[in-house]
Amino acid sequence: MLYYIIYIVCSSFIFASEFSFDTLWGQCTLVNKSSLSSNNIKETIEQEIQNMYESYGSIPLNNFSILIDNNHVQSSKHPHWKWSLGITYKNPDKIILKDPAISKISLKKFKKVIAHELNHIMLNRTQHYHTIPRWFKEGFAMKIADEISMYHKLKIASNTNKPSLFHLTNYSRFQGMNKEEFHFAYALSSASILLLDKIYGNRTSDRIAIYLIDGLTFQRSFYNATGFQIENFYQRFYNEIKKNFFWFKFINLPKNLFAIMPLILIIGFYMKSYRNKQIIEKWELEEELEKIDDTNIN
């Protein structure tokens, strides 16, 4: 904690580093207001773009900028900034990343955030980007950035008894959400991508992205990749969620058992005491009966 306090104080004296460089997607202007190495960030950007270029092909060239911000000014401009690690804008293409010293994430995690937001740039440059539902955009970006974790799976599992939360069409846009709803929407988005690849075959989400880049709408891309209309996925979604995520609840079972262990011990103590009392009463009754028998014999 002391490190972050010192950093925040000192960061006000750090001058922004700004320079431009060419990429496979066009010229990138990097504005770095953090203490991170600009050259290392540049290399990460170039590598992630190269990876997506090799996997999904070329996209229209256009200039874009990436700002690493070390203050909270953006929170007044974007309602989700205080919960986000990065935000991507279109027209013009711009990524704003929260300084990892403020968000308190590791450099490894920060590089994943870069990959996530660059993925948004890629899909935003498709001809029919406006047809892509938000759940697919976020889930696919999380997959590419390797951000899908056990946390997201447990969050889904803990809500499988609430069917109203799993109407996937409600997540075409993320609007009017509080913090809890916002994080659940991301968990649901990650689950949707996992289920797409499980139900319709490995790399289904990748094939959808390729069709999008080729100029098709999301609905047509989904059909070409799966052989089904998108409604098929919407109808199956909740049942597939229950079937594939319910068992994750049991991962928390040891922790839950530990929490109620004192109650279990108390109940066990009283059950044991009651049983012992019954045994003692039985022995006493047998002794009384033996005494009666002895008296009758005499």
Model-found features: residue ranges?
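Short, charged, low-hydrophobicity "junction" segments
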Residues: 4, 66-70, 138-139
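Bacterial Sec-dependent signal peptides at the C-terminal "C-region" and cleavage site
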Residues: 12-20, 249
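Low-complexity, flexible helical/coil segments
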Residues: 28-30, 64-68, 99-105, 132, ...
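Acidic/His/Gly-enriched intrinsically disordered linker/tail segments
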Residues: 87-94, 108-112, 127-199, 206-251
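C-terminal single-pass membrane-anchor helix
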Residues: 245-298
